Amino acid sequence: MKYTIRLYLLIALLAIFSGCSKKEAFKPGEIYNGFTLVKKQFVEEINAECLLFRHDKSGAQLLKVANDDPNKLFNIAFKTAPENDWGTPHIMEHAVLNGSKNFPVKSPFDVLIQGSLNTFLNAMTGKDITTYPVASMNDKDYFNLMHVYLDAVFNPLIYSDPKILQQEGWHYELGSKDEPLTYKGVVYNEMKGVYSSPQNELEYLVYKNLFPDNAYGFESGGHPSEIPKLTQEYFISFHQKFYHPSNSYILLYGNADLNKELEFIDREYLSGYDALEEKVEIPLQKSFNTMKEAEKTYPVQEGSPVADQTFLSLNFVAGSSTDRALCMTFDVLAQALVNHESAPLRLALQEAGIGRDVRAEFQEMQQNIFQITVQNANPEDKDRFREIVFKTLQEVAETGLEKTMVEGIINRMEFNLKEGDSAQKGLMCLFMTYQPWFHADDPFAGLEFNKPLEEVKKALNTNLLESAVKEHLLSNNHALLMVLKPEHGLQAKIEQATNEELNIYKTSLSSENLDNIMVQTTRLLEHQQREDTPEALATIPMLELSDIGKEIEWYPINEKTVANVPVLHYDDFTNDIVYTNLYFDLKDLPQELIPYASLLNALLGKLGTENYTFGELAMN
């Protein structure tokens, strides 16, 4: 991680507290601006002081990751468990960004961008989470963005303006009584595009079959065939249920003044709410008595080949995301069993001639999924695929995996964890904390990766990996063999069914009802084309030139010479990783050889050397 802390300055150890008031040492059990400090701990893995609060009145949870990083991040997330395939979590993510009580413009963030120095501005929907992260290096901008985001999620205009759901979710569109009735909407059209991919259809079917009785069996993004079932009444009730501070998880990252952050959030928003007694929980899916099998088809264009176009996928529900060591173990197994070039399952399937692309993925969730998928296969390969996978897993359980390969994979995992290669360190902390925070009320577990990593390193001298294969794969009935094969004409059938559904509905409507839909179509178009009023635009906080600092951050470089080669050195917190760049002066290289220098640069690292094969380099 590239922070600006100097390792050789003892005083820099105090910088980790820069997000806190220098006049006040935060103490667990004490109350600060309506927030009780629950836990305070220095997390060496991210070189930051982390403070977990609970807002006494509203029940909101808040984690401050305090360090000297000026790239401050604010995020508010909600546990949003879908109750159907209508796409309500996804549509709500869009909808709350269409104006709010204090900022009544059609798209506050489009306006904000014109007067903001944000380094990140987005919103995302997952299987059980909707999250709203924003970052800025400017203090005033940071609080402006925080203000707009909080108002968006807690005071959206969706209650008074049904056109927001119509625009962002779905609506009937009818230009005249002679035209066909159609479905339109931002998310509706987006998800039609998403489900034009067979990979996404496969994922949808896997979750449907593995989790038939809980929220993970539903598509939080919305399935095109189901989105038009969403009503304004249900939409409002969803916001009331899930977008309450008691169900919120707020993350603050960086060097902003913590007292100021807490005071603002409490005063402007949370103090107006009372905590709910009922907590949003997703019940666990009961395990199966025997492995499931399912087969479906996906559309392909007429005339395109169907041979070698089938997906075969074995899926296992394996433990929980709250078990950090187990999650790391399966990250290693995904590589060691399948994804590595010399992985035994990859080689066995290649030798059998099943498919042309095999991939393992591990999805961290309340109940994790380990997936082995072969593309470009055929339906008749199903039984051989299953037989080869289980035979190979049995061999691995009995004889183990190649230790040098496993060591290389673990070393790479450790490097990636320590490096945290992202310009948005706050966003990285968000993704690290959310699973254990949501499902075990412990965000620290996601940040403190050294302990589970040490457990996984034991795989080099123990049967840790082999035991995981036995317990969670070979002896696991909560599993699914999914076959997804191509079908000519399926897309035409889907479109015909949708058109017939719309036509039947249209013929059932009275002339007055048709007039109402046409009026709604016109009004929505007028709304989309109407400019915001100057009064509404004036509510959006903008930076002025005087708000922008003129200081330039300076990185002092130590210059020295080693073996007649100039060396530039900079001390920084890099989590024990040394970064070295070698630069070669090409001024004497003939012009005609310049393209070959570029080719050489592309090849280096992808070829063997005098002392190591490419495979050995990859493992090390």
Language-model regions, residue ranges each:
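An aromatic/glycine/proline-enriched structural segment found at the starts
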Residues: 24-29, 249-308, 399, 502-506, ...
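Scaffold signal of the M16-like zinc-metallopeptidase fold and its non-catalytic homologs
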Residues: 95, 99-101, 145-159, 176-246, ...
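C-terminal motif of bacterial Sec signal peptides marking the signal peptidase cleavage site
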Residues: 16-19
